[in-house]
């Protein structure tokens, strides 16, 4: 009845005196509205009179309009007009799509992502659910709207839960029926039912939301629906969900991102509510919880009491979940519950469901809201773990609770349950608590089962980065991850830490994805569907395991810290997943896991520049995907939008992509870079000096912080210093704040619970490893740098290939410098580093170091300072000669001198450069002002004409040497490459253009100016004045279009600003650029 009622209600759009749209408009304007009585007939011929009354639901706290609570009054005419108010709160599309909203005070279910529907009133929902489901006291109806609203609900929608949403169907409705109901509800066709798991599902998250609500609303119905999903409906839906994930990520993700975040927060309480309401229809909370709780319950019920026992089991599961939530984290329990319930639901419901669930749960929105969902789930998980630990629950207890809450689906509860179990082993000590947190986080992608189940769906989705595979891949990757994690967890804390790093990465795949909504959009731009969502998943799946391998097996990759950094980059990575999926990327990440993670994050922006540099073909993609990761963009213009984002993965994948994308010479370059591994990081970094900026300071953290700045998580780096290993940077501003809160909580928790916890975490995260790895990396890089520096300096011809590699090594040099101020940072190595990216490598690192120094981690700060000191000394020696010349002949010195000078200035003349930079920033702003109008006009030229200046700007922003780089790109690439200005220039213009366009370098630029005023001044000095002057000389000489310093700035800003919306930032890059990246990513 309710389903038909809703269908009828939503079908009354044309030729009616009223329509649901008009009805809701009226409700939105007047706060309430009611429809005339309308009739419809049931399958049995019963005539039902219905009237829908909707009230505008406002957030009691913010008084924001969140959605509509629609009450449908139904009367069976046969039965004598007995009004049977089956109050079905149907989530209607709320005016405020993204507003989070707590529908029910008790449920605290927010109408996050109410973009599709508002959440029904909890009380109404409960009534409705009860009426519909035999007074099952399900407030699930409410949830549907919310679920619907939040990205998580989008994701959750995809689950059986959504199908069983009471609003969508009557208690007896099967998942399919409910889905049908959902479809109308979703403002979509009946196919919506299936759609909820399809890409449309994300779009139709409203229906999904409703499904969430219904899931527990009608315990048995919901469970049956879930079971049906798991048995078959779910499978098809899930398989579709894999697809929808990308779509969700593409479209809703943007909308849902914040809601998702709110949803996560809401979810936590909703989850608790959900548990409490288990009898009532925990679904309400779960819906906001992304349905994972409901899914979990369903899963439990489905798995434990597949059929009849579902109701009891459901309530039982709910109780357990409630235990988990209330005990472990009433607010944060949701995350764990969401993850594990989702996981469980996915597992039990169906592989298909699992896939979405896994994605949703482990990927935390990998499907519908890859980034926001995953980030939220991670945050939730963090909260859960934190809360569990805070509440004094031992890891064993947490594991037990989680396992119980999850029911038989221990693997299902992998994120919470298995993680808890693993933590159980670790319960003896706080270290184990940390391990628990890490493991839970790691397990956050409880794709163990999901991966297994999803893998079938994915059909080797890990390898394939098919869109559907997107959700599947993450599961698959996650599955691997969980396995690795589980083994590692059981292994030891170090393994856990490695896992944690990896987990953080995977977690932050989602979170980053979340944070990189532009990335999501980019995914939409360039096959984001297949790439974007699925990418994040694959990245997650591939990367986390890789990270683990990296952290465990490849200390060079900075241990788990790099993974964490990578996680930081993961926000980009979610778009990078394809890259991440690439073995190369893994290899590259192995070496540059952390380095690239950070740089790549910036790279994601710069990669476009790279793309431009590597090929204008990419540039076109880059233009529209400037946000996309430059490395990816470079690797593949077509992937630029979606993939470029995966900056982290990009470093490795960038090369692979380059391999594929780059013309012969570029593949060679890639090979060179890959040969030096540094190139991997370099692959990204070279593309955007900004990346080096991120990388050099401290690849793992500095880079991360730098990247975060660009990604709008600049403030995160500080928190991250201690907790960033555990927690990746949030993708969203909200995610960031949320993540920051989480990080703060985790930090407090770890700090309070264990004074040495942070040190342990550092050790676990591989900070010591970072140093040792820095040494290993340094030796490695030393070889590479020595080789590449020599190649760079000696083989100007190979400059392009070597330039980037040289840059890469410098970056790595910066990294290893950062990791240790080893002799490896020999003059040559550093010169190569600083020569190719003296300022970039050093500057960025300096900037990065500053952020790191800001962070509590003295070890890293000291390490960075030490390395920087050595770098400065070496670079100073190298640049000393140049230094004298570069100030005067900034334009003339261009390549080597200026690079060195820029480097020298950046390090030795930071103050001077700051002043100059301020002056030049103004100039640049003026130029930007001039260029902003021209961004579109200049955008294409920047590819070619402006690209030199762009590259210079990017590189320049990354380092004072950038100015030389601008014009003599060789300079940008290496001090030892001044002879190759024309060549470098030729190559780098596209890169410059792309970088500028991407804005990552600008981000980096912004960041280092931010992080390192010295950087700014040196940059500004070398770049604005030198650059502008050079623009006058080089652009004029080299590129007529850029004869103007203003033109150059304009070009630079155009490409970066127009593409990344960083035009404003470009002028600010020097002064306020840091905000540019944040704004850009926010």
Swiss-Prot record:
Keywords: Acetylation, Activator, Acyltransferase, Cytoplasm, Methylation, Nucleus, Phosphoprotein, Repeat, Transcription, Transcription regulation, Transferase
Biased composition (Polar residues): 250-268, 279-290, 464-477, 507-516, 603-612
Asymmetric dimethylarginine, modified sites: 860, 866, 877
Motif mapping: LXXLL motif 2: 437-441
Top-level EC class as recorded in UniProt: transferase
GO biological process: cell dedifferentiation; cellular response to estradiol stimulus; cellular response to hormone stimulus; cerebellum development; labyrinthine layer morphogenesis; male gonad development; mammary gland branching involved in thelarche; multicellular organism growth
Phosphoserine sites (modified residues): 251, 269, 394, 427, 551, 554, 722, 988
Annotated segments matching region Acetyltransferase: 786-962
Primary location recorded for the protein, binned into one broad class: cytoplasm
Region span, Disordered: 138-219, 237-317, 330-374, 405-429, 455-485, 507-543, 592-617, 644-663, 691-717, 981-1004
Modified positions (N6-acetyllysine) in chain numbering: 316, 319-320, 387
Motif range (LXXLL motif 3): 723-727
Activity-regulation annotation: Coactivator activity on nuclear receptors and NF-kappa-B pathways is enhanced by various hormones, and the TNF cytokine, respectively. TNF stimulation probably enhances phosphorylation, which in turn activates coactivator function. In contrast, acetylation by CREBBP apparently suppresses coactivation of target genes by disrupting its association with nuclear receptors.
Composition skew (Basic and acidic residues), residue ranges: 293-302
Enzyme Commission no: 2.3.1.48
Pfam (any one): Nuc_rec_co-act
Stored SUPFAM superfamilies: Nuclear receptor coactivator interlocking domain (SSF69125), PYP-like sensor domain (PAS domain) (SSF55785)
Reported function: Nuclear receptor coactivator that directly binds nuclear receptors and stimulates the transcriptional activities in a hormone-dependent fashion. Plays a central role in creating a multisubunit coactivator complex, probably via remodeling of chromatin. Involved in the coactivation of different nuclear receptors, such as for steroids (GR and ER), retinoids (RARs and RXRs), thyroid hormone (TRs), vitamin D3 (VDR) and prostanoids (PPARs). Displays histone acetyltransferase activity. Also involved in the coactivation of the NF-kappa-B pathway via its interaction with the NFKB1 subunit.
Domain remarks in the Swiss-Prot or TrEMBL record: Contains three Leu-Xaa-Xaa-Leu-Leu (LXXLL) motifs. Motifs 1 and 2 are essential for the association with nuclear receptors, and constitute the RID domain (Receptor-interacting domain).
Subunit composition and interactions: Present in a complex containing NCOA2, IKKA, IKKB, IKBKG and the histone acetyltransferase protein CREBBP. Found in a complex containing NCOA3, AR and MAK. Interacts with ATAD2; the interaction is enhanced by estradiol. Interacts with CARM1. Interacts with CASP8AP2. Interacts with CSNK1D. Interacts with DDX5. Interacts with ESR. Interacts with ESRRB; mediates the interaction between ESRRB and RNA polymerase II complexes and allows NCOA3 corecruitment to ESRRB, KLF4, NANOG, and SOX2 enhancer regions to trigger ESRRB-dependent gene activation involved in self-renewal and pluripotency.
Protein name: Nuclear receptor coactivator 3
């Amino acid at each position: 009845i309710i389903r038909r009622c809703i269908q009828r209600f939503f079908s009354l759009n044309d030729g009616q005196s009223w329509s649901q749209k008009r009805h809701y408009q009226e409700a939105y304007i007047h706060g309430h509205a009611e429809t005339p009585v309308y009739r419809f007939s049931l399958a049995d011929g019963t005539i039902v009179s219905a009237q829908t009354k909707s009230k505008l639901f406002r957030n009691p706290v913010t008084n924001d309009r969140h959605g509509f609570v629609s009450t449908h009054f139904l009367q069976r005419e046969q039965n004598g007009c007995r009004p049977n108010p089956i109050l079905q709160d149907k989530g209607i599309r709320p005016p405020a799509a993204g507003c989070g909203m707590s529908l029910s005070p008790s449920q605290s279910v927010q109408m996050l992502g109410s973009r599709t529907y508002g959440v029904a009133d909890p009380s109404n929902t409960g009534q409705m659910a009860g009426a519909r489901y035999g007074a099952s006291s399900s407030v699930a109806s409410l949830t549907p709207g919310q679920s619907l609203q939040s990205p998580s609900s989008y994701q959750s929608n995809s689950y059986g839960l959504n199908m069983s949403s009471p609003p969508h169907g009557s208690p007896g409705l099967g998942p399919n029926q409910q889905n049908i109901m959902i479809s109308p509800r979703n403002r979509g066709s009946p196919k919506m039912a299936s759609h909820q798991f399809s890409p449309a599902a994300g779009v139709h998250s409203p229906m999904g939301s409703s499904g969430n609500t219904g899931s527990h609303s009608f315990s048995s119905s919901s469970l049956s629906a879930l079971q049906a999903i798991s048995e078959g409906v779910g499978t098809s839906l899930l398989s579709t969900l894999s697809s929808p994930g990308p779509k969700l990520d593409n479209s809703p993700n943007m909308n849902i991102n914040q809601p998702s975040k709110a949803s996560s927060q809401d979810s936590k309480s909703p989850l608790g509510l959900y548990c409490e309401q288990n009898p009532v229809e925990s679904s309400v909370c779960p819906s906001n919880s992304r349905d994972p709780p409901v899914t979990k319950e369903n899963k439990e019920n489905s798995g434990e009491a597949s059929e009849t026992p579902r109701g009891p089991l459901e309530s039982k599961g709910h109780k357990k979940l409630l235990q988990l939530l209330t005990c472990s984290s009433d607010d944060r329990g949701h995350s764990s519950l969401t993850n594990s319930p989702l996981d469980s639901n996915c597992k039990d419901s169906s592989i298909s469901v699992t896939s979405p669930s896994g994605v949703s749960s482990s990927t935390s929105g990998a499907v519908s809201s890859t980034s926001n969902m995953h980030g939220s789930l991670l945050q939730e998980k963090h909260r859960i773990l934190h809360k569990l630990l805070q509440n004094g629950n031992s890891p064993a207890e947490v594991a037990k609770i989680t396992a119980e809450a999850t029911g038989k689906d221990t693997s299902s509860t992998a994120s919470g349950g298995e993680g808890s179990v693993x933590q159980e082993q670790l319960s003896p000590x706080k270290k184990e608590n940390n391990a628990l947190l890490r493991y839970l986080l790691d397990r956050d992608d409880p794709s163990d089962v999901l991966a297994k189940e999803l893998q079938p769906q994915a059909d080797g989705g890990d390898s394939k980065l098919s869109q559907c595979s997107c959700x599947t891949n993450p599961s698959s990757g996650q599955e691997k991850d969980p396995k690795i994690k589980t083994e590692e967890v059981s292994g030891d804390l170090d393994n856990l830490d490695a896992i944690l790093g990896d987990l953080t990465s995977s977690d932050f795949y989602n979170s980053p994805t979340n944070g990189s909504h532009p990335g999501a959009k980019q995914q939409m731009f360039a096959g984001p569907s297949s790439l974007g969502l699925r990418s994040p998943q694959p990245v997650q799946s591939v990367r986390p395991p890789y990270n683990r391998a990296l952290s465990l097996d490849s200390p060079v990759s900075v241990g788990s810290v790099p993974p964490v950094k990578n996680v930081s980059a993961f926000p980009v990575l979610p778009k990078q997943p394809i890259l991440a999926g690439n073995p190369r990327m893994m290899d590259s990440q192995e070496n540059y896991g952390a380095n690239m993670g950070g740089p790549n994050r910036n790279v994601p922006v710069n990669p476009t520049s790279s793309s431009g540099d590597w090929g204008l073909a990419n540039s076109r993609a880059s233009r529209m995907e400037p946000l996309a990761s430059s490395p990816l963009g470079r690797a593949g213009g077509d992937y630029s939008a979606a993939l470029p984002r995966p900056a982290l993965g990009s470093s490795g994948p960038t090369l692979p992509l380059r391999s594929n994308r780059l013309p012969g010479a570029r593949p060679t370059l890639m090979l060179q870079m890959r040969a030096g591994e540094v190139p991997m990081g370099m692959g990204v970094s070279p593309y955007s000096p900004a990346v080096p900026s991120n990388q050099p300071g401290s690849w793992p953290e500095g880079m991360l912080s730098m990247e975060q700045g660009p990604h709008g998580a600049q403030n995160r780096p500080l928190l991250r210093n201690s907790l960033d290993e555990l927690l990746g940077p949030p993708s969203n501003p909200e995610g960031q704040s949320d993540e920051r809160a989480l990080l703060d909580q985790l930090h407090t928790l770890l700090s309070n619970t264990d004074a040495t916890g942070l040190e342990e975490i550092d050790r676990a995260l591989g900070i010591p490893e970072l140093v040792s790895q820095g040494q290993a990396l340094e030796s490695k890089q030393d070889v590479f740098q020595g080789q590449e520096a020599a190649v760079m300096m000696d083989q100007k011809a190979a400059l392009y290939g070597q330039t980037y590699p040289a840059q890469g090594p410098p970056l790595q040099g910066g990294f290893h410098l950062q990791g240790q101020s080893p002799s490896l940072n020999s003059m040559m190595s550093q010169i190569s580093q600083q020569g190719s990216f003296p300022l970039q490598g050093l500057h960025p690192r300096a900037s990065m170091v500053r952020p790191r120094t800001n962070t509590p981690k003295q070890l890293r700060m000291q390490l960075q300072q030490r390395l920087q000191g050595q770098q400065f000394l070496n670079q100073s020696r190298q640049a000393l000669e140049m230094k004298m010349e570069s100030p005067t002949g900034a334009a003339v010195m261009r390549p080597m001198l200026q690079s060195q000078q820029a480097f020298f200035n950046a390090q030795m003349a930071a103050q001077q450069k700051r002043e100059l930079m301020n002056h030049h920033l103004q100039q640049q702003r003026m130029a930007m002002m001039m260029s902003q109008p021209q961004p579109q006009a200049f955008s294409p030229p920047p590819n070619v004409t402006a690209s030199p200046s762009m590259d210079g700007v990017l590189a320049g922003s990354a380092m004072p040497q950038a100015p030389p780089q601008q014009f003599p790109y060789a300079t940008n690439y290496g001090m030892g490459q001044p002879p190759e200005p024309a060549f470098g220039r030729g190559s780098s213009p596209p890169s410059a253009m792309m970088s500028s366009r991407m804005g990552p370098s600008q981000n980096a630029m912004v960041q280092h100016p931010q992080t390192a005023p010295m950087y700014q001044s040196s940059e500004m000095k070398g770049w604005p004045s030198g650059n502008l002057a050079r623009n006058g000389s080089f652009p004029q000489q080299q590129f007529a279009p850029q004869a103007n310093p203003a033109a150059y700035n304009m070009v630079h800003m155009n490409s970066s600003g127009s593409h990344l919306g960083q035009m404003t930032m470009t002028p600010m890059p020097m002064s306020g650029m840091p905000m540019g990246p944040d704004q850009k990513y926010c």
